[in-house]
Regions:
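Non-cysteine beta-strand/loop elements that form the S-adenosyl-L-methionine
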Residues: 86-98, 162-170, 234-242
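Hydrophobic faces of well-ordered beta-strands that scaffold small-molecule active sites
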Residues: 61-65, 85-87, 114, 139-143, ...
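Alpha-helix-loop-beta-strand connector modules within alpha/beta enzyme cores
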Residues: 111-114, 120-137, 182-202, 253-257
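N-terminal capping/small domains of soluble enzymes
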Residues: 2-138
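Glycine/Thr-rich beta-alpha phosphate-binding loop at enzyme active sites
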Residues: 25, 29-43, 115, 172-185, ...
Length: 257
């Protein structure tokens, strides 16, 4: 048994998962945390460099959105050797997210289900946090909203703080995002982003289909892909978590990772 497995099984997994995550956020926000995380950094000299949206990366391994929703611990994460980090997901106004409990573990399957619903401090506070950093690791900002105007405003406000964007219309825990699952609304969003484009962006699509990718799901994806191709979108993220029901969660459902 590894040290991590011993600690997680015997200590961390005894507590609520969101509580543990919040505790780690506090620890990693300490001014000494970057020195601690640098001890666990590995050299990338044997890892193939790659590119994403024109940006050279020292590693193809990245930290996905959701770990540092408020960009509060980027200094510590910057030392871990990721090819890039995705901050957020950020919304225009602060959001509390869904009611708790909103994360549960499936320890036997090495998996978890979350129904967070984009809890974050809002773009104003996150810009304040971002202003404190001079990162070596390339940063992508994940943004989302209930309307095209929300998303385009976030794009403009955050463009000075990252090399690109991940447009998140994929969360299974945010009901209003289904507005963008309509093909016309989706394409209007893309066109609106292209009208103000100053940085590259990629679209994060939701999971379609059940356990297998049936013909109906393939047709849905093909339609989205065609829209992305026709409008010269820089990248695509596939896909968000798998929607499941779980009575432990306050809202009764979430996304399986």
């Amino acid at each position: 048994m590894t040290l991590y497995r011993f600690i997680s099984n015997n200590i961390l997994f005894k507590f609520d998962p969101e509580f543990i995550h919040d505790c780690m956020q506090v620890i990693l926000s300490n001014k000494f945390a970057p020195y601690l995380t640098s001890l666990y950094s590995t050299s990338n000299k044997h890892i193939s460099k790659t590119y994403i949206m024109g940006q050279e990366l020292n590693s193809p391994l990245a930290l996905a959105a959701g770990f540092d929703k408020n960009c509060a611990i980027l200094k510590a994460l910057d030392k871990l050797g990721f090819g890039y980090i995705v901050g957020g997901t950020v919304t225009i106004n602060p959001r509390p997210g869904n009611l708790k409990p909103r994360i549960t573990r499936y320890v036997d399957n090495n998996s978890m289900v979350n129904s967070l619903g984009f809890p974050n401090l809002g773009v104003e506070k996150i810009i304040e946090n971002l202003s404190n950093y001079d990162l070596k690791t390339p940063l992508i900002m994940s943004i989302s909203g209930d309307s095209i105007s929300d998303i385009t405003e976030l794009y403009k406000l955050l463009s000075d703080y990252c090399f690109g964007f991940e447009i998140n219309i994929s969360s299974p825990n945010t009901e209003k995002l289904k507005y963008f699952h309509d093909y016309n609304n989706f394409e209007n969003l893309i066109k609106s982003l292209n009208d103000i484009k100053s940085k590259p962006y990629m679209i994060k699509l939701p999971r379609f289909g059940i356990s297998t990718l049936d013909q109906k799901s393939k047709s849905i994806y093909e339609k989205y892909f065609q829209i992305l191709s026709d409008n010269n979108v820089d990248g695509l993220v596939l896909s968000n978590t798998f929607p499941v029901e779980d009575s432990i969660l306050k809202v009764g459902q979430g996304g399986l990772s």
